[in-house]
Amino acid sequence: MAALDGSFGYEMEIITHPDSGISTIEDIRGKQLAFSSPTSNSGFKAPSAILKADYDMVAERDFEPAFSGKHDNTILGVANKDYMAGAIANKVAVRMIARGVIKKEQIISIFKSQTFPTTGYGVVHNLKPELQTKIRNAFFNFNWEGTSLQKEFEKGNEGQFIEMTYLSL
């Protein structure tokens, strides 16, 4: 997904609630940090790598990890003070605030990563070219107007698919 101006991506943020006493990454030591799931980039892999590389912090040794199941649960858990802190994809929080699920004042960001590319869709190399074209056209010619997808993604200022490519080495 991309914004109408062509910008795309999201950042991993580590959030906390205003009463947590946490204002820096180092303040998480000895406390609980919620992750979404072990397979999530922004909900586990990126924060784990950043915490280890930049802060010498490792789960179990320096903080207690918890898995909420998904970004929404982590955000709700932090906002409702069930978790002291959590690692999230910030676009999810933006949409939850826009829907009125939480109030912006319920969470504070103490860390924001570089921008990561959003989810990519692709086709296998040996798929018939005609079918590859049809799949591509389904994405790029999708009529957003009036759909539930438009309603949801415009809250995060997103509203189009963009072409992505890769670098051959």
Residue map of PLM features:
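Short beta-strand elements of ligand-binding domains
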Residues: 1-2
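Bilobed "Venus flytrap"/periplasmic-binding protein-like clamshell domains
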Residues: 5-76, 91, 159
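Periplasmic-binding protein-like
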Residues: 5-16, 40-42, 101-136, 139-169
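Short amphipathic alpha-helices in soluble, non-transmembrane regions
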Residues: 27-29, 135-139
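Second-shell loop/turn segments in exported
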Residues: 34-40, 79-83, 122-124, 158-163
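A ligand-binding cleft/hinge motif common to bilobed small-molecule-binding domains
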Residues: 47-53, 77-80, 84-104
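Surface-exposed interaction patches
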Residues: 73, 80-84, 91-92, 122, ...
